[in-house]
Design a protein with these regions (language model features):
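Glycine-rich loops and low-complexity Gly/Arg-rich segments
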Residues: 23-27, 37-42, 49-53, 78-81, ...
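Conserved beta-strand -> loop -> alpha-helix junction used to position metal-binding or nucleic-acid-contacting
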Residues: 53-100
């Protein structure tokens, strides 16, 4: 499940079956909230669908809000979070190594990644703990705050980054790539119809998504 936007106040939240590739449900929304994601899952279950697992982008509070359903965080979204903290081409050696490690996410297993992350942290722990003093206030702050935040993000989300591996028999995708590709195709086609008003745009989306 995932959401895409046109502008700031018109979006489509889509629920897709990863096995059959069928679009199951959609909402037109102004704001992406966890409430709508829960509403979607509830509606699907009420219709008789057996929700074996959920793949989502890792919104705050969403990953741990489904008590009885395995949740996989999209590994591409995790990589994007890291890039926002340390950029796509970091200069610090510690950041370069972390960036290279994150690139392995879709290609490795849980034990290998956890072991490599543990080794990275032990290697750079002293560096991460470095502090800088503000000469005007006398207060100190972490010198490499964004790198620390990048590491903390991975460490916090690690529980949900390998749900596919912990439940290998379910065949859970490790990304929301199928939906994102669908959204990209939809947006490309809509660019050829820029003059559509909201009502006609919704009609176009309805016909494209067939749900």
């Amino acid at each position: 499940m995932d959401t895409t936007y046109w502008g700031r106040s018109f979006g489509v939240m889509l629920f897709k079956d990863a096995i059959t590739k069928e679009n199951l449900l959609k909402f037109y929304i102004k704001t992406e909230t966890n409430y709508f994601y829960h509403q979607g899952i509830d509606q699907l279950q009420a219709k008789g669908y057996n929700v074996l697992a959920i793949v989502c982008d890792g919104r705050r509070g969403l990953l741990n809000s489904f008590d009885d359903i395995p949740v996989q965080m999209c590994q591409f979204h995790q990589a994007a979070i890291i890039r926002r903290y340390i950029t796509k081409n970091p200069r610090l050696l510690a950041a370069i190594e972390l960036n290279e490690l994150v690139r392995l996410l879709p290609k490795t297993d849980k034990e290998s990644f956890k072991g490599a992350l543990f080794e990275w942290f032990n290697k750079w722990k002293t560096f991460l703990d470095e502090r800088t003093i503000n000469i005007e206030t006398g207060k100190s702050f972490y010198t490499h705050k964004r790198l620390r935040s990048a590491y903390r993000s991975i460490k916090t989300n690690l529980k949900w980054l390998f749900t596919w591996y912990d439940n290998i028999e379910l065949g859970i995708p490790n990304t929301t790539g199928a939906i994102e590709g669908h959204f990209a195709d939809l947006k490309n086609k809509l660019r050829n119809h820029n003059g559509l008003n909201l009502k006609r745009k919704k009609r176009f989306i309805d016909e494209f998504l067939k749900v």
